[in-house]
Amino acid sequence: GDYGSGLMWGARGVGAFIGPLLFRYFYGSSDGKLLSTIGPGIMIWGIFYFLIPFSTSLYLTVFLLIIAHCGGGAQWAFSSYGLQILTPDKLRGRIAGIDYTFYFSMYTISNLLIGYLATKYDILLLFRYFPMLGFLFGFIWYLQTFFVNIVHIVFK
């Protein structure tokens, strides 16, 4: 009901708030370390969203959402930060605007897609496949940035 929905929406916000703080605390505050957490952040989101359909209680679901959005919040914060440090001052506002436009466009499109697919397929099936897809994207991002960091270290 409304109580459960409110708790779950709140859990997303709590996770998105504390995620970047926790990642910064555990990974360090240098630019390279923060930017290297983007892939793991996406993977954490995927793992914990994948576990939600197996949850047996509202409070376990809330916990899983908090952890998932710790990863998602860190990913969004540090990818936005990465764009800011790599963008020249005179273009920064425009690039940030484009970033937010893409983010909210993809958020809308993915919600519409999942809403449509939920009318055709079992919602629990979708709740397993979409997080796996997110995890896969995070893993690919991690591998790409890992190898870029290795090449940078070796050839520096």
Positions of predicted regions on the chain:
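C-terminal transmembrane bundle of multi-pass solute transporters/carriers
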Residues: G1-K156
